């Protein structure tokens, strides 16, 4: 019995000891939790005294600050230095001691007081800290002043956009959130942003986004703003879906200029192209020749639209006419180099322009005595190919042949300029020497007065055939 009573007593003592320890521990926990969260001294009692080691171990980190910066410029900008006096968070906050400003009479001392509305007096510092409206008003600080950073963050407004309903968000280099923050499957827009970040060449960038305003008609296909907008220049698709309106795809009609898909098979009545119109658009020289031979007349409305063809036909205004030599159509004015010298200096404005001849005019009356004589292979005033040539006018150079003579240099080339048949060399009309578009007077001694010594060589070259261009007089 004694042994049983002793064991019961020991168990009872152990139970009481356990209960006492539990009560003491709970009271200690309550006392610790009742202590203030921010004690006066935050410095721990550790053997380390080097500030670099303490900062590296994280003992200098302030729980209130989000960015653990140690650079003095960054700390000064964020207001973490002891000497920094940050502006008031509240606009109308008043200083507790308003009377201390009465003790100061120096303007600099008054400006340094906390009761002063703005501690900074430099306009650049005021603009950087957000005092753009006035000293008594506080705006949120904007650390970025570079125009590229402002444009990237969406802080630049467009002139053609409504500023009431613009949604901006910074365009990050990687628009996809970290894996630790993704708690749901990605939607279509977020998948597009991921594809855009991986392959920016295939998907349009943020600068090519069309931002839609609420005041704009939702399905306005014919609105000029849809196509004149600076964001809609190259594409109507995507940007990061962070507070931005995703533009809807507008199915363009057949009149849309930027419609890159093929046109439908059904065409409207005014767009139907007849086969006759296609045949009428042919601009072949051979077809024109056949028409001229069949009709016996020349069409005045030329079908040619190429600038080279128009220049060869002489239909383009120019200071110096140089066409006709390389014409393949036979309609150009047939001017020789010797005639070209006098064309611009002739009083007749129609100099060098010749008339077409019809078939009855070309055919000479047939003598009944010559009926047995075969006709000549090439009729007069005609081309070997069958094209009718021009009728020479009275102001052309006189010659015996109906066709223009080739520019063969005479024995004395200078006599061609002295014996000008169009000029009456009197005292009232002095002699002139013509070279292209220049009109140079003769010297009083009777010799030519040359502006450049190389003119003689040029004139001598013009008198010989041009062997480098064998087809120059091919069709003339």
From Swiss-Prot:
Keywords: Amidation, Cleavage on pair of basic residues, Neuropeptide, Secreted, Signal. Residues 1-34 form the signal peptide. GO terms for cellular component: extracellular region. Residues 275-298, 360-385 are annotated as: Disordered. GO terms for biological process: neuropeptide signaling pathway. It comes from the Eukaryota. Its main location: secreted. Disulfide bonds: none annotated. Residues 160-232, 259-476 form a propeptide. It is found in: Secreted. Neuropeptide-like precursor 1-1: Expressed in antennal lobe (AL), corpora cardiaca (CC), corpora allata (CA) and gnathal ganglion (GNG) (at protein level). Expression in AL detected in all animals, in GNG in most animals, expression in CC and CA in few animals (at protein level). Neuropeptide-like precursor 1-2: Expressed in antennal lobe (AL), corpora cardiaca (CC), corpora allata (CA) and gnathal ganglion (GNG) (at protein level). Expression in AL detected in all animals, in GNG in some animals, expression in CC and CA in few animals (at protein level). The modification Valine amide is found at residue 133. Residues 286-297 have a biased composition (Acidic residues). The keyword Aminoacyl-tRNA synthetase does not apply. This is Neuropeptide-like precursor 1. It comes from Agrotis ipsilon (Black cutworm moth).
């Amino acid at each position: 019995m004694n042994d049983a009573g002793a064991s019961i007593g020991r168990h009872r003592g152990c139970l009481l000891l356990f209960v006492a320890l539990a009560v003491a521990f709970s009271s200690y926990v309550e006392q610790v939790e009742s202590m203030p969260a921010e004690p006066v001294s935050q410095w721990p009692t550790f053997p380390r005294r080097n500030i670099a080691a303490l900062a590296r171990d994280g003992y200098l980190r302030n729980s209130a600050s989000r960015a653990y910066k140690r650079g003095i410029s960054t700390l000064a900008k964020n207001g973490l230095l002891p000497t920094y006096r940050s502006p008031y968070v509240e606009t109308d906050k008043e200083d507790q001691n308003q009377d201390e400003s009465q003790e100061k009479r120096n303007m600099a001392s008054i400006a340094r007081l906390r009761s002063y509305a703005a501690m900074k007096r430099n306009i650049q510092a005021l603009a950087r800290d957000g005092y753009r409206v006035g000293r008594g008003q506080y705006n949120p600080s904007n650390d970025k002043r570079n125009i590229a950073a402002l444009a990237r963050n969406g802080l630049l407004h467009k002139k053609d956009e409504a500023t009431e309903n613009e949604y901006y968000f910074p365009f990050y280099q990687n628009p996809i959130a970290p894996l630790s923050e993704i708690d749901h499957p990605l939607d279509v827009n977020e998948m597009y942003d991921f594809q855009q970040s991986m392959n920016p060449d295939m998907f349009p960038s943020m600068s090519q986004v069309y931002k839609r305003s609420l005041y704009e008609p939702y399905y306005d296909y014919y609105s000029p703003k849809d196509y004149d907008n600076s964001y809609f220049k190259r594409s109507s698709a995507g940007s990061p879906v962070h507070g931005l309106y995703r533009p809807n795809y507008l199915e363009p009609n057949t009149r849309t200029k930027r419609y890159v898909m093929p046109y439908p098979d059904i065409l409207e009545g005014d767009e139907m192209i007849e086969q006759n119109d296609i045949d009428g658009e042919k601009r072949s020289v051979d077809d024109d020749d056949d028409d001229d031979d069949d009709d016996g007349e020349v069409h005045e409305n030329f079908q040619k639209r190429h600038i080279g063809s128009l220049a060869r036909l002489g239909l383009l205004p120019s200071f110096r006419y140089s066409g006709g030599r390389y014409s393949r159509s036979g309609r150009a004015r047939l001017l020789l180099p010797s005639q070209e010298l006098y064309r611009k200096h002739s009083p007749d404005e129609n100099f060098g322009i010749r008339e077409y001849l019809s078939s009855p005019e070309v055919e000479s009356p047939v003598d009944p005595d010559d009926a047995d004589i075969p006709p000549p292979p090439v009729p007069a005033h005609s081309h070997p190919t069958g094209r009718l040539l021009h009728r020479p006018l009275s102001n052309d150079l006189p010659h015996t042949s109906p066709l223009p003579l080739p520019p063969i240099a005479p024995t004395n080339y200078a006599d061609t300029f002295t014996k000008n048949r169009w000029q009456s060399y009197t005292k009232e009309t002095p002699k002139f020497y013509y070279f292209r578009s220049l009109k140079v007077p003769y010297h009083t001694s009777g010799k030519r007065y040359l502006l450049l010594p190389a003119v003689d060589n040029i004139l001598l070259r013009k008198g010989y055939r041009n062997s480098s261009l064998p087809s120059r007089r091919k069709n003339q």
